[in-house]
Amino acid sequence: MKLYSLSVLYKGENKVHLLKSAYDVSSFSFFQRSSVQEFMTFTSQLIVERSDKGSRSSVKEQEYLCHVYVRNDSLAGVVIADNEYPPRVCFTLLEKVLEEFSTQVDRIDWPSGSPATIQYNALDSYLSKYQNPRDADPMSKVQAELDETKIVLHNTMESLLQRGEKLDDLVSKSEVLGTQSKAFYKTARKQNSCCDIM
């Protein structure tokens, strides 16, 4: 999972222009880096130009995903990431960056601003912080821990059962479970197996 670009743009009436951007092109060869960076800027501007105000969308290009968020006030953000990077985290990042940008940079400067004139330096730190979505986003961290717990729980259940033994057999032989609990287990098992067949 990797983030390559984080950009803040202004969607004017006739033209979209870049206000500020940060790039991580370290995974590309040295001679390709400037071309890749130019292409990311071009792609970001094109996607914002073709997106409606008040919209969020993701555009796939080969193994990359471009996530765009254009606010109603014409401020827009674009994240370019690989396919594996979670889109929810990208949109959370865009929302956070655009909100912070709008409070730190005067709205009057947006239509005429450029990367050289806009005083906002947080993009590089956001780009590096969000390289690992699990560390940057609490929901991703919780989801990953939940997935790990499910795997451990599944492995534990498998190891508790002896070779050739099935949970169904154990339930039917159990003296601890009441008839109502056994009936509930069998009914649940039948309903789940019905869904598996379809």
Curated annotation (Swiss-Prot):
Lipidation (S-farnesyl cysteine): C195
Membrane topology recorded in Swiss-Prot or TrEMBL: Lipid-anchor
Prodomain residues: 196-198
GO biological process, one term: endoplasmic reticulum to Golgi vesicle-mediated transport
Domain of life, per lineage: Eukaryota
GO cellular component: a single term: cytosol
This protein's record includes keyword Membrane: yes
Top-rank EC class of the record's enzyme: transferase
InterPro entries in the record: Longin-like_dom_sf, Longin_dom, R-SNARE_YKT6, V_SNARE_CC
Segments forming domain v-SNARE coiled-coil homology: 138-198
Main subcellular localisation: cytoplasm
Sorted UniProt keywords: Coiled coil, Cytoplasm, Cytoplasmic vesicle, ER-Golgi transport, Golgi apparatus, Lipoprotein, Membrane, Methylation, Palmitate, Prenylation, Protein transport, Transferase, Transport
Keyword Chloroplast found: no
Localization (cell): Cytoplasm, Cytosol; Cytoplasmic vesicle membrane; Golgi apparatus membrane
Enzyme Commission number(s): 2.3.1.-
MF annotations from Gene Ontology: protein-cysteine S-palmitoyltransferase activity; SNAP receptor activity
Residue positions, PTM Cysteine methyl ester: C195
Gene3D superfamilies: 1.20.5.110, Longin domain
Cysteines engaged in disulfide bonds, as pairs: none
PANTHER family xref list: SYNAPTOBREVIN HOMOLOG YKT6
Domain comment (free text): The longin domain regulates palmitoylation and membrane targeting.
Similarity field: Belongs to the synaptobrevin family.
Protein name (Swiss-Prot/TrEMBL): Synaptobrevin homolog YKT6-B
Source organism of this protein record: Xenopus laevis (African clawed frog)
